[in-house]
Amino acid sequence: MAKIPAGLHSQMNSMSNDEPIPVIIRRKQGFFRSQAMPMVAEVEQSFQLFPGEAVKITAAEIDELSRQEGIEEIWPDLPVRTWLDTSVPVIAAPKVWALGVKGAGIKVAVVDTGIDSTHPDFAGRIMATKSFVSDSAQDDNGHGTHVASIVAGSGAKSNGKYVGVAPEASLYVAKVLRADGSGSMSGVMAGIEWAVLEQNVKIINLSLGGVGSCDGTDALSVMCDEAVTQAGVVVCVAAGNTGPEERTVGSPGCARLVITVGAMDDSGRIASFSSRGPTADGRVKPDIVFPGVNIVAAQAAGTHMGQVVAAGYVAANGTSMATPHASGVAALMLQDNPELTADQVKTKMLAGAVDLGVPANDQGVGRGDAFKAYEQATATPTPTPPPTPTPPTPTPPPDSKPSEPQGCLAALFSRR
């Protein structure tokens, strides 16, 4: 495998010799930074889920670095952005609440634009925050607050009208996007590692991504898959808002092990903006769809995202809004069966979906259903009944012969 992907080669050729290029480097296992990249003096960010660093170096330095034995791959550190372009009853979440299950004790990370920590809908449930782009994790865009509200808003300010999918889940917020909704892959990756390695979350919501088809081998997609395999974290990712054309699911929605979420309206029609598959390497994406049109959730103070529908609440569209529905459903599933692996959560969530009768690369397996996913998560396998004892066959008299059926059965069992 080439250490420098074609896209980075093109970028190198278009830049002046002394202009720094932001890249993400993956070292081979067993090579320390000083061994693998001795010519790199300054590092923007170091990673632990895989051995690597984010740096800014010139095209000549990238070329030199690619020749080092300890370097496995060099990726461009591409920009990412938010995917913003009456949903909870549609996915049957209240039926799960009626069982006393609202996501209590489940740690969900929202990696986004931050959160309005003063909003009443989050009172007592923002457990930790960290900003990777500014001094404060306070939301100066509005997107992260809206997303967090869909996952776990209590609806307190609306007297219970605008409630999130898992209103008792605990929130961990990494601010990785700036006030204009933009950020970098390396910044998102840093937020993921903080959530996984420092906060031990069970679920990560990524309502963000890059533009353009991908095959799941870029740095951010690889990091998401590492979070699933190494830490057992459920990672829910927005498919993107560049539909309805095919091959429009961007990174990290093209990652293999994440739950990639497309958007539908309340009537079950796939939103025109929802990105479609397949991925660049031919896999079906998205995996599932949830409501993402005219979704009402909390508004961050002082922000202007979406359309105001009530004091403290705005309506917005996008796969950004669909994705936290999946994260909330995962929290409901894990509350009563915390031993589920990330792969089991994905498998069972998809098994409970309702087919909308459209192509798989538009809908995945169909519309997510919180109650059916919960049933899948908590179903007790039917035990296999013990074999019925077979009485011993009487010994035939010396002059008798075994019957033909006995001979057939003996031959059958001898083939195992």
Identify the meaning behind each predicted range:
Residues M15-R27:
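Short glycine-/aliphatic-rich beta-strand segments at the starts of folded cytosolic domains
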Residues A148-V151, Y172, V176-R178, T248, ...:
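Hydrolase catalytic cores
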Residues V163, K202-N205, Q335-R416:
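C-terminal subdomain of the subtilisin-like protease fold in secreted/lumenal serine endopeptidases
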Residues W97-V111, I115-A128, D135-M185, Q199-K202, ...:
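Subtilisin-like serine protease catalytic core
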